[in-house]
Amino acid sequence: MKGSYKSRWVIVIVVVIAAIAAFWFWQGRNDSRSAAPGATKQAQQSPAGGRRGMRSGPLAPVQAATAVEQAVPRYLTGLGTITAANTVTVRSRVDGQLIALHFQEGQQVKAGDLLAEIDPSQFKVALAQAQGQLAKDKATLANARRDLARYQQLAKTNLVSRQELDAQQALVSETEGTIKADEASVASAQLQLDWSRITAPVDGRVGLKQVDVGNQISSGDTTGIVVITQTHPIDLVFTLPESDIATVVQAQKAGKPLVVEAWDRTNSKKLSEGTLLSLDNQIDATTGTIKVKARFNNQDDALFPNQFVNARMLVDTEQNAVVIPTAALQMGNEGHFVWVLNSENKVSKHLVTPGIQDSQKVVIRAGISAGDRVVTDGIDRLTEGAKVEVVEAQSATTPEEKATSREYAKKGARS
């Protein structure tokens, strides 16, 4: 009984599987028949279209820019540090107790402004003593001169000897010398009193105070009272390769001050503009560079002592230069070249001679002319004589290109 029961179940399962397989097979044939007419129609239409696709594929998309003619400034660049035109540590020239400070930390001061005071009592006393001694010796001199006058009259009648007359004359001369010494003592005491009032020796900005009121200070203190840095004007010291010396000297011979620009650490913002002050008198043999100093008015306090900046010095301007985007300039086995577009948007390779350049623009001295269109993007897909599709043409007459040109003219280039 159990064996026949299992056999029936096996037969049922086999029948169900066979039915499902037959259904799938029949459904697949119907789908093939319904798709056949469309496929046949497509097959009838495809040969011509297929041959057309083989003959002409899609055009390579490129971006292009127009070569323009413009004046291009040439800059020499270097790294530099802002230095104060003068740095003065204000120290006391006399010993005594500091009784007053007359400045605020960070304040701009003028030469002669009162900065600090030392207790003047001892200096006033010394001055009074010197003045008293001077007055005493002046009285002695006056009396000696009167005696000399009497001796001279008596000597005419031989009432006094020649020796006595000479002695009186010597006394007068001695007293006159004493007077001069007294006058020097008075001047010295007055100077000590004057030095008890400490004034600014130069214009500039005071730093943080180095000593507090009430402290005893002396002329031998090395830290001083405060440091003044002169920042109006302020200097920039930067270095240039020794190969640039001839260029700078030649530009100086033109007779016009050379403009130097100070840019921030990231070279993205111009901080100030000044002029070349001088070149150092020797080259650093270790680095092969020479130090250059420029001076800035710095009335807006844009520059600060010990600030790191990028320096750019204008040495020449190339007029009527043919300029293209730097992205268009390529380098191959033959040398530098660009891809030039003709009126039919077909490209051809032109060997060129580049001049001064920066990250945005490059001057082309030979190989193309102003008005030529050059490929700036999509260059890796180009072959000689290929026709391309210009998807974004740029020209120096567009607002965007004008802005780029202005930025280029502002930043300049370096050969």
UniProtKB/Swiss-Prot annotation:
GO cellular component: efflux pump complex; periplasmic side of plasma membrane
UniProt keywords, alphabetically: Cell inner membrane, Cell membrane, Membrane, Signal, Transport
Membrane-protein topology: Peripheral membrane protein
Keyword Iron: no
Cleavable signal peptide: 1-21
Composition skew (Basic and acidic residues), residue ranges: 399-415
Pfam families: HlyD_D23
Chain positions covered by the region annotation Disordered: 32-60, 392-415
Biological-process GO terms, alphabetical: bile acid and bile salt transport; xenobiotic detoxification by transmembrane export across the cell outer membrane; xenobiotic transport
InterPro entries in alphabetical order: CusB_D23, Multidrug-R_MdtA, RND_pump_MFP
Localization per record: Cell inner membrane
Statement: the UniProt record of this protein carries the keyword Cell cycle: no
MF terms in GO: bile acid transmembrane transporter activity; efflux transmembrane transporter activity
Record's note on what induces expression: The mdtABC operon is transcriptionally activated by BaeR.
Function (record text): The MdtABC tripartite complex confers resistance against novobiocin and deoxycholate. MdtABC requires TolC for its function.
Sequence similarity: Belongs to the membrane fusion protein (MFP) (TC 8.A.1) family.
Quaternary structure note: Part of a tripartite efflux system composed of MdtA, MdtB and MdtC.
Name of the protein in its database record: Multidrug resistance protein MdtA
Species the sequence originates in: Escherichia coli (strain K12)
